[in-house]
Amino acid sequence: MVALALLGLIVAAIYSSWYAIVRGSRTGLQAAAAAQRMRVAARTLEEALTSARSYAANAKLYYFAAENGDKAYLSFVARLSKSFPRSGRFGELDVRRVTFSLEPAPDSGKQLVLRQSPLLMDWSQDEQEHPAVLARDVKEFTVQFWDAHATPPDWTDEWTQTNELPSLVMFSLAMGEDPSHLGRAGHMIVRFVALPTVTVQPGVQAPGPGPGPPGAPRPPGPQPAQPAGPS
């Protein structure tokens, strides 16, 4: 009887150790998967922001809009690469409006989703109802903008200049639960993105006629100064 009892204790100890290893491995895999999803979501946001486009003459089409809070979103027009998520759906239509939004998930919690629509086209029903899910179990999605017009320049969480691109955007994404701190997100990422473009003004977007070939009659009106030839 004593031997059987000792054997039972040994088996129980082995099982407990094995279960702890399996549970730790599962937790580690879940954490790694969550971190990878967060990196993919952040990279998608960065790629879209660095491809943003804006033309002042078409401000109604190229507006830049954002909102923070429980229904946070970020929407703008970008010229996207072929490797951008879901680009295959749109063929050669690489100039599209992208909207990143924080929405309730079907099961519970919230998720960060991406919708796209080619410029000058309405949103498709499929894109509206079945957006690309970039991240699940999102606790927070916030966006801030560098306001160069403020005195002094500073960060703001409200971008009211919808017909102008911000020069610098900071976004943060928090996901999951920290098992050691109840109520705290398990993963958080912060990125600073410098937009490599500015809003194109009408005079640049639609320049006037050039000087034409040599000997051609010049258009009426003041002419630009010509460089002096060699003396």
Protein language model features and the residues they cover:
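N-terminal single-pass transmembrane signal-anchor helix
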Residues: M1-S17
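Secondary-structure transition/capping residues
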Residues: G8, S25-G28, A56, H149, ...
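Short, mixed charged/polar active-site loops
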Residues: E92-R97, Q128-P131, G183-V190
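Short linear sequence signals and composition-biased patches located at protein termini or domain-edge surfaces
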Residues: A135, T142-S231
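Low-complexity, Gly/Pro-rich coil/beta segments used as flexible assembly/activation regions
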Residues: A56-G91, D126, V133-S167, V198, ...
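Extracytoplasmic beta-strand-rich oligomerization domains located immediately C-terminal to a leader/signal peptide
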Residues: A13, S17-E127
